[in-house]
């Protein structure tokens, strides 16, 4: 264990206003406590939620803001009470960096549903300092919210699993779908989360149908990701033929869309699981749910326990995310491309290999 300092400075890339443009920003990290891990960041994935935050789409953004919550790095120092990690470990940190540890969700190891959870960025830590994310040189994180990256897993591949991976893994396990081989599942939307949904559901032995508004991703879905079928939601004939065929649908679409067409695809007792962050009320008519005893539910990222399970599952099954690695000075272009769905399927920033204090 090295000597922990009360204050350290690091440089990240921050948004200053709702334009969402990021540029170098040097700031002071929070004080390192006895249960904290000091991490040198190596890679950080880019998530669509980062766009919502830097552009104040949800109306709660505070600036300057360093985004990034798919963080993989190396442990540089550990606090005196840290028991889970040692210097040199390759570790990850996701969306949450704090919780109350006393409420019902916390005691049930689903701390992501704690009403007092602390986000990895755009939040305030218990010491009053703003939290800043993974597009930076270093982070200080409570050991509870850090996971070990399994041996043999490439760190750049691990980064998207900490959000996109566990976001899909959590409902598949919570709703008992993981253990039932042969289920017929639908993945609505083939982006960063959706492509992980295909890979994870297939590894669980499910028959997977990708649902998209056009056929432009059909070859990719079937030939490269291993989906069993592809359904074009704008084709009325295809949708009618697929009625009552799916046990569940994982809806990853982050923009407003009608639910009725997808409810019609579900079998009796089927589940429509919402995952996209949408700031517009969704609509459906109640008979679409009542007449098939169908359920519309949601799921939010995953717990630390689920994250550890998911990483082990992916390592065992050889599941990786499909990524494009970029340097930090490309991040604004990467955000622009992500908004246009011009990425296959997740950007990962090579933080350690970037000059954080320089713009192009």
From Swiss-Prot:
It catalyses: (E)-cinnamyl alcohol + NADP(+) = (E)-cinnamaldehyde + NADPH + H(+); (E)-coniferol + NADP(+) = (E)-coniferaldehyde + NADPH + H(+); (E)-sinapyl alcohol + NADP(+) = (E)-sinapaldehyde + NADPH + H(+); (E)-4-coumaroyl alcohol + NADP(+) = (E)-4-coumaraldehyde + NADPH + H(+). It is an enzyme of class 1 (oxidoreductase). The keyword Ubl conjugation does not apply. It holds the Pfam family ADH_zinc_N. Zn(2+) 2 binds at residues 100, 103, 106, 114. SMART domains: PKS_ER. PROSITE patterns: ADH_ZINC. NADP(+) binds at residues 49, 167, 189-194, 212-217, 252, 276, 299-301. Its EC number is 1.1.1.195. Its cofactor is Zn(2+). GO terms for molecular function: cinnamyl-alcohol dehydrogenase activity; coniferyl-alcohol dehydrogenase activity; zinc ion binding. Coiled coil: none annotated. Pathway: Aromatic compound metabolism; phenylpropanoid biosynthesis. Keywords: Lignin biosynthesis, Metal-binding, NADP, Oxidoreductase, Zinc. Zn(2+) 1 binds at residues 47, 69-70, 163. GO terms for biological process: lignin biosynthetic process. SUPFAM superfamilies: GroES-like, NAD(P)-binding Rossmann-fold domains. InterPro entries: ADH-like_C, ADH-like_N, ADH_Zn_CS, CAD-like, GroES-like_sf, NAD(P)-bd_dom_sf, PKS_ER. Binds 2 Zn(2+) ions per subunit. Belongs to the zinc-containing alcohol dehydrogenase family. Involved in lignin biosynthesis. Catalyzes the final step specific for the production of lignin monomers. Catalyzes the NADPH-dependent reduction of coniferaldehyde, 5-hydroxyconiferaldehyde, sinapaldehyde, 4-coumaraldehyde and caffeyl aldehyde to their respective alcohols. Homodimer. This is Probable cinnamyl alcohol dehydrogenase 1. It comes from Aralia cordata. The gene is CAD1.
């Amino acid at each position: 264990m090295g000597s922990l300092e009360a204050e350290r400075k690091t440089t990240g890339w921050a948004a200053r206003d709702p334009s969402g443009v990021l540029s170098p920003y040097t700031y002071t990290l929070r004080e390192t406590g006895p249960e904290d891990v000091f991490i040198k960041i190596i890679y950080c994935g880019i998530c669509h939620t980062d766009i919502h935050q830097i552009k104040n789409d949800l109306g709660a953004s505070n600036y300057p803001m360093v985004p990034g919550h798919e963080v993989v790095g190396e442990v540089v120092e550990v606090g005196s009470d840290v028991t889970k990690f040692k210097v040199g470990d390759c570790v990850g940190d996701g969306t949450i960096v704090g919780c109350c540890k006393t409420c019902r969700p916390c005691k049930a190891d689903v701390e992501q549903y704690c009403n007092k959870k602390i986000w990895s960025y755009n939040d305030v830590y218990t010491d009053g300092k703003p939290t800043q994310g993974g597009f930076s040189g270093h982070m200080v994180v409570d050991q509870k919210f850090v996971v070990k990256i399994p041996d043999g897993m490439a760190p750049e591949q691990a980064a998207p699993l900490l959000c996109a991976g566990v976001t899909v893994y959590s409902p598949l396990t919570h709703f008992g779908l993981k253990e039932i081989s042969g289920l017929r599942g639908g993945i609505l939307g083939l982006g960063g989360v959706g492509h992980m949904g295909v890979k994870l559901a297939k590894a669980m032995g499910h028959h997977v149908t990708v649902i998209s508004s056009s056929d432009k991703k059909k070859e990719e879905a079937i030939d490269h990701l291993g989906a069993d079928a592809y359904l074009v939601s704008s084709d009325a004939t295809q949708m009618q033929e697929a009625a009552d065929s799916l046990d569940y649908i994982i809806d990853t679409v982050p923009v407003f869309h009608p639910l009725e067409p997808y409810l019609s695809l579900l079998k009796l007792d089927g589940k429509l699981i919402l995952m996209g962050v949408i700031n517009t009320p969704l609509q459906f008519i109640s008979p679409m749910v009542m007449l098939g005893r169908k359920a519309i539910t949601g799921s939010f990222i995953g717990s630390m326990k689920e994250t550890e399970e998911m990483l082990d599952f992916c390592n065992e099954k050889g599941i990786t995310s499909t990524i494009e690695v970029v340097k930090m000075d490309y991040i604004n272009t990467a955000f622009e491309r992500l908004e246009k769905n011009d990425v296959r399927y997740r950007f990962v920033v090579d933080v350690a290999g970037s000059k954080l204090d320089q713009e192009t």
